[in-house]
Amino acid sequence: MLCAGVSLIATSCSGWLDREPSNATPTDEALNSVDLLDPMITGLFDNLQGSSNSTSYYAASFIVFGDVRGDDVQATQPAMRTSPLYEMRYGRSNCPNMWAKPYSVIRSANRLLQACDNLHKKVTLDADKALLSNARAQALAVRALAHFDLARIYALPYSQTNGETMGFLWLLKL
């Protein structure tokens, strides 16, 4: 009886169970409607904002990152969110991760730009073209902000390098 139950359970889903992962759809097939632009823009700004934990982007540590690390602010209280930045005392759980966060935002912006380029070939209505233009402008602005943030943190001053080095990787495509 046990063997019959196990064989019934093991074979009962084979006809209707989708075995392909839901995230296996290529980007240009998944982002194929102008109606998806608004949720994509919301996701882009949510990625820029982050959450309130200490490894977040604009919701937490980036706002004070330069000031605290440059001694403009003294964060000497041990319970403060900025004390690990001030003391430069990092571990796996509290690393500010200021390299990966902007690149995550840049990747999201590049995906939105790719979707806009793919949709631009398909849309014919002026209203849809205006939505595409708006989404494209927002993605370009957020991507530029993330690149600027990387330059503020990692690039050397222009006077030291005469503009010969960028200080970070410039990502304009996926």
Per-range role (PLM):
Residues P78-Y154:
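Conserved, well-structured interaction surfaces
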Residues L36-P39, R69, L174:
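Hydrophobic-face positions in mid-chain alpha helices that act as interaction patches
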Residues M1-T11:
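Sec-dependent bacterial lipoprotein signal peptides
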Residues Q49-T55, A146-P157:
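Secretory-pathway/luminal and periplasmic proteins that interact with or process carbohydrate-rich
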Residues F62-D71, K129-A135:
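Acidic helix-start/capping segments at beta-turn-to-alpha-helix junctions
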Residues N23-T25, L125-D128, K173-L174:
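Short linear capping/connector segments at secondary-structure termini
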Residues S159-L174:
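Short, flexible helix-coil linker/hinge segments at the edges of structured domains or between repeats
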Residues C13-I63:
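Membrane-proximal, proline-rich intrinsically disordered regions
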